[in-house]
UniProtKB/Swiss-Prot annotation:
Belongs to the ATP-dependent AMP-binding enzyme family. GO terms for molecular function: carnitine-CoA ligase activity; crotonobetaine-CoA ligase activity; medium-chain fatty acid-CoA ligase activity. It comes from the Bacteria. HAMAP family: CaiC. This is Crotonobetaine/carnitine--CoA ligase. Catalyzes the transfer of CoA to carnitine, generating the initial carnitinyl-CoA needed for the CaiB reaction cycle. Also has activity toward crotonobetaine and gamma-butyrobetaine. PANTHER family: ACYL-COA SYNTHETASE, MEDIUM-CHAIN ACYL-COA LIGASE ACSF2, MITOCHONDRIAL. It comes from Salmonella newport (strain SL254). The lineage of its organism: Bacteria, Pseudomonadati, Pseudomonadota, Gammaproteobacteria, Enterobacterales. Pathway: Amine and polyamine metabolism; carnitine metabolism. Keywords: Ligase. The keyword Ligase applies. It is an enzyme of class 6 (ligase). Its EC number is 6.2.1.48.
């Protein structure tokens, strides 16, 4: 079943502008509380002007342009402006430093960058090193340095027509984006995403949360991340909903923003759930319009129940990764939810559990979660310029090896166990980091927890726990180890513990374990 019907992103926006016109498409709120709002018709004009801006700078179909931006409307304009002329967006994680950013520029052969003033000093150094093909920077902001090869985004865009001046032939198979994975354990890989991928993501995720044109979808997820793009922005726009994009996450402001914009759907990661729960309880906690909170791994049953009870809104679990584009396994609209299951496989996909010899496993047995989709349509097309890595992850028949461990029950519900690289081998036993983290997080004094494996001459690996305590709490080693011994098998009890003020995280809130070993 082809639900995209050959429609590329240029056609999508022209159609949306015609159908929804003056209806609000995008609301953006900055950290300072400044609000900018765009209708479907006006945002399409902004996108067209931005497309013409890129054309005026020499960008043509197939060229790659990098974006290094925090959340802002200009990210949306650039994303779809590039797509309208067949060019390719290369979003860069806004937290990356110079060497990491330069590596992405070099490996994607980017000559033009759009960024903001706060990141400009880093890129000025990169250009001076001559280590990348970068030769022009388009800056967003009020200040414009008097440097060669630098232009001002707002000034250039304001000069452009709202009618496209360059309309090359487009296909849904054309690449729209190269999104580099977070690379917490090695160099990031460029995930190639097509026009079809993004259109499909919009329809699929809108189905998953039963999104309608009277919904308001609010997100704080970074726009350079797959979650914001394919489980928030694309479904919101595809359904004709209103998309609310916040510049940054604030636990203190979050519920006020939900109420202010009358959001009906939002998305959260575990870090957000936990920080929202430590805010002082208020009589207004349940006074909102949210009907769904899209949720991504991992959370203990105690944390899930406490959140649902306090705020009166359920979590809709969705499992996926950059390569799957969307949450290919998850809760379904109107279907039973079986916590801690991650749900059932969505339409257009197949899923099964396989052993180390790549053979399907029966219900109840733990193995690798494998997903079948159509490359370039329902799953990513390939890793950019890395055919060997593509071949390792993606079988010719469309089966994707996720690298995650899980199992399936007799009713077709899937259960996530751990990232396969997140298993600790201890004295012949496989220990799931997630299992231990869920158990330990139930301790009333602990706010955040991560466990890692460290080398052990006798038992392969020993287990070390890094802990962040709730404000004002103290925790002795004796108290910690006693709690563990009472709540888990002896071979799972950590050998070491370390208390920290915070844990290192990447842009999507995932803990960077390599920084803890």
């Amino acid at each position: 079943m082809d639900i995209v019907g050959g429609q590329n992103l240029r056609q999508m926006w022209d159609d949306l502008a015609g159908v929804y016109g003056d209806k609000t498409a995008l609301i953006f709120e900055s950290c300072e509380g400044i609000v900018r709002q765009f209708s479907y018709a006006s945002i399409n004009e902004e996108i067209n002007r931005t497309a013409n801006l890129f054309y005026s700078l020499g960008i043509r179909k197939g060229d790659r342009v990098a974006l290094h931006l925090d959340n802002c409307p200009e990210f949306i304009f650039c994303w779809f402006g590039l797509a309208k002329i067949g060019a390719i967006m290369v979003p860069i994680n806004a937290r990356l430093l110079g060497e990491e950013s330069a590596w992405i520029l070099q490996n994607s052969q980017v000559s033009l960058l759009v960024t903001s003033a706060q990141f400009y000093p880093m890129y000025r150094e990169i250009r001076q090193d001559n280590s990348t093909p970068l030769n022009h920077i388009c800056l967003i902001g009020e200040q414009l340095p008097a440097d060669d090869g630098v232009s001002h985004f707002s000034q250039l865009q304001a000069r452009q027509s709202a009618t496209l001046c360059y309309t090359p032939a487009l296909s849904t198979d054309d690449t729209a984006e190269i999104l580099f994975t977070s690379g917490t354990t090695s160099r990031p890989k460029g995930v190639v995403i097509t026009h079809y991928n993004l259109r499909f993501a919009g329809y699929y995720s809108a189905w998953q949360i039963a999104l309608r044109d009277d919904d308001v979808y609010m997100t704080v997820m970074p726009a350079f991340h797959i979650d914001c793009q394919c489980t928030a922005a694309m479904p919101a726009f595809s359904a004709g909903s209103t998309f609310v994009l916040l510049e940054k996450y604030s636990a203190r402001a979050f519920w006020d923003q939900v109420r202010k914009y009358q959001a009906t759907v939002t998305e959260c990661i575990p870090m957000m759930i936990r920080t929202l729960m430590v805010q002082p309880a208020a009589p207004t906690d349940r006074q909102h319009h949210l009907r769904e909170v899209m949720f991504y791994l991992n959370l203990s049953a105690q944390e899930k129940d406490a959140f649902t009870e306090r705020f009166g809104v359920r979590l809709l679990t969705s499992y996926g990764m950059t390569e799957t584009i969307v949450g290919i396994i998850g809760d379904r609209p109107g279907d039973k939810r079986r916590w801690p299951s991650i749900g059932r496989v969505g339409f257009s996909y197949e899923a099964e559990i396989r052993d180390d010899q790549n053979r399907p496993l029966p219900a109840g047995e733990i193995g690798e979660i494998c997903i079948k989709g159509i490359p370039g349509k329902t799953i990513f097309k390939e890793y950019y310029m890395q055919p060997e890595a593509t071949a390792r992850a993606l079988e010719p028949e469309g089966w994707l090896h996720t690298g995650d461990s899980g199992y399936q029950d007799e009713d077709g519900y899937f259960y996530f166990v751990d990232r396969r690289c997140n298993m600790i081998k201890r004295g012949g036993e496989n220990v799931s980091c997630v299992e231990l983290e869920n158990i330990i997080s139930a301790h009333p004094k602990i706010q955040d927890i991560v466990v890692v494996g460290i080398k052990d001459a006798i038992r392969d690996e020993a287990i070390k726990a890094f802990i962040v305590l709730n404000e004002g709490e103290t925790l002795s080693e004796a108290e910690f180890f006693s709690f563990c011994e009472n709540n888990m098998a002896k071979f799972k009890v950590p050998s070491f513990m370390e208390i920290r003020t915070d844990l290192p995280r990447n842009c999507s809130g995932k803990i960077i374990k390599k920084n803890l070993k």
